[in-house]
Amino acid sequence: MRKTIVEMLKNAGEDFISGESIAGKLGISRTAVWKHVQKLRENGYEILSRERRGYKLKDAPDLLLPSEIQIGLDTKIIGKEMDYQPSVDSTNRVAKALAYHGAAEGTIVVAEEQTGGKGRLDRNFFSPRGKGIWFSVILRPKILPKDAPKLTLMAAVAVAEAMNRFNIKPEIKWPNDIMFDGRKIVGILTEITGEIAKISYIVVGIGINVNISREEFPEELRDIAASLSEINGEELSRVEFFRAVLKELDNLYIELSEAGFDKILERWKKYNITLGKNVRVISASDVEKSFTGKAVDLNHDGALVVETEGKLRAVYAGDVSIR
């Protein structure tokens, strides 16, 4: 309902729109409209009000609010339901709890900051307030658990396609890091809940460094992390970029369900910087175990095929560094 109010205010531009008009559109009282406007103001919207004239939107906050993100989103699955958190330890944790209690497929959990964001191999993920897009999406795909890695690759392609829309060239390092000049911009963590032969739900967590300056990164990350604004030369609208990512996720998830993985795999290969390179692979199950070889292909399941000691070895999970 607040999304509709914001949309009406934005469509009115510099004109005021009466409380009566808003009430009629929504089928509620003018008092209820006033209460919604007050809540929007609490969320950071600057809304002017004038007796006998109504309301006018003067400024919208740079926050990842559903009332902002869902305007013009027009997705079929992803982002129809959104859970907004000003601050949370981990969006994946919240999303898993919501999924366990029956949240709809496509539900998004998004936060302004994460205080305990996690990456692969239980690493911390730097997620400062208002500087990036930290979110998780709940999926309930009708696939076997062995096919779950395809969703990680799909998510990487979705973010890469969104970057293309903003004229930023993406580079994907298997399985799910998006890089620029050897520095990480995007991380993806996929967590599966289910049985041996059936997936109950999958939570795909995505962290995107949007408007973080080099100086704002912790010193230990400055040489290995980057942000979209650093590449672009100016700050990006987090709302617009997030909306673009959700649209790409929606399109690719539907494509995966209806047409399979082949074309998504082709697009992943187009963006990849791993194949043909010498790599070091760290096992997801035992970080003390690693091996080196040459990344030669991705198989149909999304596993990285590495030539090592004269044999081909398929890697389904782990961490890869390019040598």
Language model segments and positions:
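Long, positively charged amphipathic alpha-helical accessory segments at protein N-termini or as interdomain linkers
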Residues: 1-29, 38, 42, 143-170, ...
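Conserved active-site carboxylates
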Residues: 177
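Short loop/edge segments at beta-strand edges and connector loops
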Residues: 86, 172-174
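N-terminal lobe of the biotin/lipoate ligase/transferase fold
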Residues: 2-161, 193, 236
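A short, compositionally biased micro-patch
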Residues: 50, 128, 173, 298-299
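Structural motif
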Residues: 81-82, 106-108, 133, 171, ...
